[in-house]
């Protein structure tokens, strides 16, 4: 991601201007980073009803929330970060798609440390020229099936439909849970 952003800023004057306008409107710091928006969805070229469609793949795109709605509506500002063939993820990668996403997030936040060290970009700003842009994970946009695959969660069919929510339990188990150890609100 770091090298892609540096390449785009150095080779595209339009992208450099978008990043520069965003920086001038809302400069970021390690304490107030910009938010990455990650979008993922499965793409099925050809016959979607075919059972053994080996051409099916999962596409991962990323953008920056701070670009704002005026820019985010343009597909040119959603950058393809990964194209993962579904049959490869399923058969060769531990954890399937979740394992792939884990590798991406680890690369960005643990290896490249885009949240702590930032990404050095040449925006051509007078007197400073280079800026250090920091990022944190802001949103993950996906449909139900992609959500399930990205987070290795059961999604709507499970007892934990949202990663930030508490488990869903039946009314019959509430008295038992409250007497054991869980405070029920």
Model-derived regions: residue spans:
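Charged (Asp/Glu and Lys/Arg) segments that form or flank catalytic channels of large polymer-
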Residues: 1-38, 105, 114-185
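N-terminal leader/presequence-like segments
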Residues: 27, 45-46, 85
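E2/UBC-UEV (E2-variant) core
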Residues: 53-120, 171-185
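Residues in well-ordered beta-strands of folded domains
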Residues: 39, 61-65, 80-84, 136-140, ...
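Short acidic, Gly/Ser-rich segments with clustered Asp/Glu that frequently serve as metal-coordination loops
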Residues: 42-50
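A short catalytic or substrate-binding loop motif that flags glycine-/basic-rich loops and adjacent residues
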Residues: 29-30, 52-54
């Amino acid at each position: 991601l770091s090298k892609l952003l540096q390449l785009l800023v150095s080779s595209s004057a339009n992208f450099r201007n978008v990043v520069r306008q965003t920086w001038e409107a809302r400069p970021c710091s390690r304490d107030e980073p910009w938010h990455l928006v990650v979008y993922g969805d499965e793409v099925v070229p050809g016959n979607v009803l075919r059972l053994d469609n080996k051409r099916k793949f999962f596409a991962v795109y990323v953008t920056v929330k701070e670009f704002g709605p005026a820019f985010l509506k343009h597909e040119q500002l959603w950058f393809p970060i990964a194209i993962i063939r579904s049959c490869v993820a399923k058969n060769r990668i531990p954890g399937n798609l979740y394992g792939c996403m884990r590798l991406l997030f680890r690369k960005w936040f643990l290896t490249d440390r885009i949240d702590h060290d930032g990404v050095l970009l040449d925006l051509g700003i007078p007197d400073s020229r280079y800026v250090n842009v920091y990022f944190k994970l802001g949103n993950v946009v996906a449909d139900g099936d992609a959500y399930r695959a990205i987070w290795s969660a059961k999604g709507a069919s499970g007892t934990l439909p949202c990663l930030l929510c508490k488990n869903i339990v039946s009314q019959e188990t509430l008295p038992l849970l409250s007497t054991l150890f869980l405070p029920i609100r």
